[in-house]
Amino acid sequence: MWALALLLMMTLFGGYGVSTHKKLKELQKRTEKAYGMMAVPLDARLERIDRMLAGEEQTLLSGIREARRAVEANREKREDRLCAETRLTLAIAAAAQAVVDEEERAILSRIALLEQDIALCKEDYNAAVQALNGKVRSFPAGLIAAVRKFSVLPLFGESKGALAH
Protein backbone atom coordinates (compact mmCIF):
# COMPACT_ATOMS: atom_id res chain seq x y z
CA MET A 1 0.00 0.00 0.00
CA TRP A 2 2.74 2.44 0.99
CA ALA A 3 4.71 1.50 -2.08
CA LEU A 4 1.72 2.30 -4.28
CA ALA A 5 1.22 5.66 -2.58
CA LEU A 6 4.93 6.42 -2.94
CA LEU A 7 4.86 5.44 -6.61
CA LEU A 8 1.81 7.64 -7.18
CA MET A 9 3.45 10.63 -5.49
CA MET A 10 6.69 10.16 -7.44
CA THR A 11 4.71 9.99 -10.68
CA LEU A 12 2.87 13.21 -9.81
CA PHE A 13 6.07 15.03 -8.84
CA GLY A 14 7.85 13.69 -11.93
CA GLY A 15 5.03 14.89 -14.17
CA TYR A 16 5.08 18.27 -12.47
CA GLY A 17 8.86 18.46 -12.92
CA VAL A 18 8.64 17.68 -16.63
CA SER A 19 5.85 20.19 -17.24
CA THR A 20 7.67 22.84 -15.23
CA HIS A 21 10.89 22.23 -17.16
CA LYS A 22 8.98 22.57 -20.45
CA LYS A 23 7.42 25.82 -19.27
CA LEU A 24 10.82 27.17 -18.20
CA LYS A 25 12.32 26.25 -21.60
CA GLU A 26 9.38 27.91 -23.36
CA LEU A 27 9.82 31.09 -21.31
CA GLN A 28 13.56 31.04 -21.94
CA LYS A 29 12.99 30.77 -25.72
CA ARG A 30 10.47 33.61 -25.56
CA THR A 31 13.03 35.73 -23.73
CA GLU A 32 15.74 34.91 -26.28
CA LYS A 33 13.40 35.74 -29.18
CA ALA A 34 12.42 39.06 -27.60
CA TYR A 35 16.09 39.89 -27.05
CA GLY A 36 16.85 39.03 -30.68
CA MET A 37 14.06 41.34 -31.83
CA MET A 38 15.38 44.11 -29.62
CA ALA A 39 18.97 43.65 -30.83
CA VAL A 40 18.03 44.76 -34.36
CA PRO A 41 17.02 48.35 -33.50
CA LEU A 42 19.78 48.56 -30.88
CA ASP A 43 22.38 47.68 -33.52
CA ALA A 44 20.78 50.07 -36.00
CA ARG A 45 20.96 52.85 -33.43
CA LEU A 46 24.68 52.23 -32.95
CA GLU A 47 25.19 52.27 -36.70
CA ARG A 48 23.31 55.56 -37.06
CA ILE A 49 25.37 57.13 -34.29
CA ASP A 50 28.56 55.91 -35.97
CA ARG A 51 27.38 57.42 -39.26
CA MET A 52 26.54 60.66 -37.52
CA LEU A 53 29.99 60.86 -35.99
CA ALA A 54 31.71 59.89 -39.25
CA GLY A 55 29.63 62.41 -41.19
CA GLU A 56 30.45 65.11 -38.68
CA GLU A 57 34.15 64.45 -39.03
CA GLN A 58 33.91 64.39 -42.84
CA THR A 59 32.02 67.69 -43.00
CA LEU A 60 34.45 69.34 -40.65
CA LEU A 61 37.46 68.03 -42.52
CA SER A 62 36.33 69.11 -46.00
CA GLY A 63 35.67 72.71 -44.95
CA ILE A 64 38.83 72.83 -42.90
CA ARG A 65 40.94 71.40 -45.75
CA GLU A 66 39.87 74.17 -48.12
CA ALA A 67 40.53 76.87 -45.55
CA ARG A 68 43.87 75.30 -44.64
CA ARG A 69 44.94 75.36 -48.29
CA ALA A 70 44.16 79.07 -48.33
CA VAL A 71 46.33 79.55 -45.22
CA GLU A 72 49.20 77.63 -46.84
CA ALA A 73 48.90 79.68 -50.04
CA ASN A 74 48.96 83.00 -48.15
CA ARG A 75 51.82 82.51 -45.68
CA GLU A 76 54.01 85.30 -47.03
CA LYS A 77 51.87 88.37 -46.37
CA ARG A 78 50.67 88.85 -42.83
CA GLU A 79 47.42 90.49 -43.88
CA ASP A 80 46.57 87.72 -46.36
CA ARG A 81 47.53 85.04 -43.88
CA LEU A 82 45.38 86.56 -41.13
CA CYS A 83 42.50 86.76 -43.56
CA ALA A 84 43.02 83.09 -44.48
CA GLU A 85 43.31 82.14 -40.80
CA THR A 86 40.03 83.91 -40.14
CA ARG A 87 38.46 81.92 -42.99
CA LEU A 88 39.85 78.77 -41.40
CA THR A 89 38.31 79.66 -38.04
CA LEU A 90 34.99 80.44 -39.72
CA ALA A 91 35.17 77.22 -41.74
CA ILE A 92 35.57 75.20 -38.56
CA ALA A 93 32.64 76.98 -36.90
CA ALA A 94 30.44 76.81 -40.03
CA ALA A 95 31.17 73.14 -40.63
CA ALA A 96 30.36 72.26 -37.04
CA GLN A 97 27.14 74.30 -37.18
CA ALA A 98 26.12 72.72 -40.49
CA VAL A 99 26.50 69.27 -38.98
CA VAL A 100 24.36 70.21 -36.01
CA ASP A 101 21.73 71.85 -38.18
CA GLU A 102 21.32 69.42 -41.09
CA GLU A 103 22.97 66.04 -40.90
CA GLU A 104 22.76 65.65 -37.17
CA ARG A 105 19.08 66.54 -37.10
CA ALA A 106 18.28 64.01 -39.81
CA ILE A 107 20.26 61.28 -38.10
CA LEU A 108 18.84 62.19 -34.69
CA SER A 109 15.30 61.98 -36.08
CA ARG A 110 16.09 58.49 -37.41
CA ILE A 111 17.54 57.60 -34.03
CA ALA A 112 14.33 58.88 -32.38
CA LEU A 113 12.30 56.48 -34.56
CA LEU A 114 14.62 53.66 -33.54
CA GLU A 115 14.11 54.65 -29.90
CA GLN A 116 10.37 54.06 -30.37
CA ASP A 117 11.07 50.60 -31.81
CA ILE A 118 13.46 49.90 -28.95
CA ALA A 119 10.81 50.94 -26.41
CA LEU A 120 8.29 48.46 -27.88
CA CYS A 121 10.87 45.67 -28.00
CA LYS A 122 11.92 46.54 -24.46
CA GLU A 123 8.35 46.03 -23.24
CA ASP A 124 8.15 42.60 -24.90
CA TYR A 125 11.56 41.58 -23.61
CA ASN A 126 10.86 42.76 -20.05
CA ALA A 127 7.48 40.98 -20.04
CA ALA A 128 9.16 37.74 -21.13
CA VAL A 129 11.91 38.16 -18.53
CA GLN A 130 9.40 38.90 -15.77
CA ALA A 131 7.44 35.75 -16.65
CA LEU A 132 10.61 33.64 -16.61
CA ASN A 133 11.92 35.25 -13.42
CA GLY A 134 8.55 34.75 -11.71
CA LYS A 135 8.63 31.06 -12.55
CA VAL A 136 12.29 30.70 -11.49
CA ARG A 137 11.59 32.39 -8.15
CA SER A 138 8.38 30.48 -7.38
CA PHE A 139 8.12 27.39 -5.23
CA PRO A 140 8.39 24.51 -6.15
CA ALA A 141 9.28 25.49 -9.74
CA GLY A 142 12.34 27.27 -8.34
CA LEU A 143 13.74 23.93 -7.20
CA ILE A 144 13.50 22.54 -10.72
CA ALA A 145 14.92 25.77 -12.12
CA ALA A 146 17.91 25.52 -9.79
CA VAL A 147 18.58 21.90 -10.74
CA ARG A 148 18.29 22.72 -14.46
CA LYS A 149 20.45 25.84 -14.05
CA PHE A 150 17.85 28.44 -15.00
CA SER A 151 18.68 31.80 -13.51
CA VAL A 152 17.03 35.15 -12.96
CA LEU A 153 17.64 37.47 -15.92
CA PRO A 154 18.01 41.25 -15.73
CA LEU A 155 15.34 43.52 -17.12
CA PHE A 156 16.41 45.90 -19.87
CA GLY A 157 17.16 49.19 -18.16
CA GLU A 158 17.66 47.61 -14.73
CA SER A 159 20.94 47.84 -12.86
CA LYS A 160 22.59 44.67 -11.57
CA GLY A 161 22.10 45.77 -7.97
CA ALA A 162 18.34 45.71 -8.41
CA LEU A 163 18.39 41.97 -9.20
CA ALA A 164 18.94 41.16 -5.54
CA HIS A 165 15.30 42.03 -4.79
Describe every region a protein language model picked out:
Residues 2-165:
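A helix-centric hydrophobic-segment signal that preferentially recognizes long
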